[in-house]
Amino acid sequence: MKKLLVALSLIAGSLTASAQWGRPVDYAAGPGLKDAYKDYFTVGVAVNKFNISDPAQTAIVKKQFNSVTAENAWKPGEIHPKEGVWNFGLADSIANFCRENGIKMRGHCLCWHSQFADWMFTDKKGKPVKKEVFYQRLREHIHTVVNRYKDVVYAWDVVNEAMADDGRPFEFVDGKMVPASPYRQSRHFKLCGDEFIAKAFEFAREADPTGVLMYNDYSCVDEGKRERIYNMVKKMKEAGVPIDGIGMQGHYNIYFPDEEKLEKAINRFSEIVNTIHITELDLRTNTESGGQLMFSRGEAKPQPGYMQTLQEDQYARLFKIFRKHKDVIKNVTFWNLSDKDSWLGVNNHPLPFDENFKAKRSLQIIRDFDAAMDNRKPKEDFVPNPMNQPGQEYPMVNSEGYARFRVEAPDAKSVIVSLGLGGRGGTVLRKDKNGVWTGTTEGPMDPGFHYYHLTIDGGVFNDPGTHNYFGSCRWESGIEIPAKDQDFYAYRKDINHGNIQQVTFWSESTGKMQTANVYLPYGYGKVVKGKQERYPVLYLQHGWGENETSWPVQGKAGLIMDNLIADGKIKPFIVVMAYGLTNDFKFGSIGKFTAEEFEKVLIDELIPTIDKNFLTKADKWNRAMAGLSMGGMETKLITLRRPEMFGYWGLLSGGTYMPEEIKDPKAVKYIFVGCGDKENPEGINKSVEALKAAGFKAEGLVSEGTAHEFLTWRRCLEKMAQSLFK
């Protein structure tokens, strides 16, 4: 059992962090967002009373953020509910927390139609006051708040949401149809017109001569609202109103906005201000709004995986645009600390910390960006993937390793390709006006073969443009990224080729027919000096989720053998590739895996069948066993238990051998271990050194630029084969 666990741990170590056999990942490990973005902009968060009093929550705030906004405590209706009545308790607590921890604040907000101190509009008898009285009260409010907190505040949302939403271009006033006003028809506007905006900024500048004064609003990416905001701010600034910047509320969702609309808004506002803040960022899972949000509240439910991918991708796209415009974007503020705090409801899963204040993968994606990739564009030399269906142009690959996809699904809301970078679960495609979804991987893929599938609105489908390949216990789409050294597995017209035959045999131990594919070298069966030549045999195993087709097709084992034989690098031998019973194994029961079931099939049923029906040299010194990944685990377990059966052993991303595990050093002539350089290269090198020091003939390969994937294993087979049966 100890040997088994060692093998399993080595394979687990070759996988990415998020895939290591279900191990939890601490996505908060590493620098805080404020540190990751120190050369770009400040990163902030809106807080409530719990966020600044609970030690676990305050630790998150202090590590991740260098800007804080009071979610509600500073809003006029909260802090100044009645004339002469001030609720400074929570407001002071938040300000003092920031003072004590050296965190600057955004002051939100001084004047807003909602959560406002509505008493300012009426006298003690409830009758409307004149605008002069309103202005006097508003000035007193602004001066009191600003003077109390300006030592810790660097920017103020002076006026919030004063512009009308997109809607009808006309409205009825006094029974007449007139062009709709660009302004929200608030009590402020009805009393004062747009002058209240100018007055609020004038009062704020009086109180804080150096603070950054912002106009803040939502739906800034909508063309109509964007232009209304632009025109208002431009008009005000031309009149001398001290508006320093625009706050773009980021209440977005996983489908909207796209980069083009967001960038248009940023560029448009940059024409009139040199400071933009993304003030209220969250990404709702659905498109609910208003009263519909009640359906996202209550007990937390898991976020569907594909929606998580969409959300992570949207966060990555947004922050890429934010970084691009760091010259004008000075702050990005998340609206709340966790899903539990969010006004959108916990089941919208809108923030990088979940309802238990645990970091999500989206935090890691936002933080661990690659600045070099921000402006990188693929070379436009795309050609059809060599594994495409006849006549199909997509998917395409280019010389750098990028992949490009095209899917027709006009009624779909989302299409995801399960290939891509950044740990985001794939490449999210975008739909054009014709209902065609297209997209390109964020960066170059590792060269070689990759499985993938499409997720369309949560359903899993294969790409109709390419052939299907068995992996992950199902038929998947496949794509081949060109490799610099691909000639060793390329089809060559100038040489003779062997063939691959399918063999079926009855397995008494499993009670069913089993299948194997057998590679026979060119010339097999020919009579030489009056008798047929016999051949050594390599038993070559696939990994978890695969089957007997994997090595012949994805692994290109036959072509690798043909090319080695033609170049005189090896003498011909047979390769048997059988289903290894791996796919009944369930993650979570790893300690129970012994490979004993396949050992019975292999030793008692398959080998006798092969020796009976093919021209084999039927002894251990002419028999080898090797396997990739879980097939490597099987290889290690079986060769150590049954050393009398195999004289050559090979593990391909399937763990390592150590001298102390092998009871009889004379039991094996040659040991091979290999993996990709993104897996466990240290383990491979250590194993080879130890085996050689103990007197074993051992060889290793660390595949350059690859991970747990077929180019690694093709390279391993090519190298290992040259040392077998010698």
Curated annotation (Swiss-Prot):
Signal in keyword set: yes
Broad EC category: hydrolase
EC identifiers of the protein: 3.2.1.8, 3.1.1.73
pH dependence text: Optimum pH is 6.0 for xylanase activity.
Swiss-Prot/TrEMBL keywords: Carbohydrate metabolism, Glycosidase, Hydrolase, Multifunctional enzyme, Polysaccharide degradation, Signal, Xylan degradation
Database matches in Pfam families: Esterase, Glyco_hydro_10
Catalytic activity field: Endohydrolysis of (1->4)-beta-D-xylosidic linkages in xylans; feruloyl-polysaccharide + H2O = ferulate + polysaccharide
UniProt-listed InterPro entries: AB_hydrolase_fold, Esterase-like, GH10, GH10_dom, Glycoside_hydrolase_SF, Ig-like_fold, Ig_E-set, Xylase_Ferestase
Upregulating conditions: By growth on ester-enriched corn oligosaccharides.
Annotated effect of mutating residue 629 to A: Marked decrease in feruloyl esterase activity
Biological process according to GO: xylan catabolic process
Keyword set includes Hydrolase: yes
MF annotations from Gene Ontology: endo-1,4-beta-xylanase activity; feruloyl esterase activity
Feruloyl esterase, as annotated region: 370-726
Pathway in which this enzyme or protein is active: Glycan degradation; xylan degradation
Highest rank taxon of the organism: Bacteria
Subunit structure of this chain's protein: Monomer or homodimer.
Family: In the N-terminal section; belongs to the glycosyl hydrolase 10 (cellulase F) family.
Name of the featured protein: Endo-1,4-beta-xylanase/feruloyl esterase
Source organism of the structure: Xylanibacter ruminicola (strain ATCC 19189 / DSM 19721 / CIP 105475 / JCM 8958 / 23) (Prevotella ruminicola)
Gene field: xyn10D-fae1A
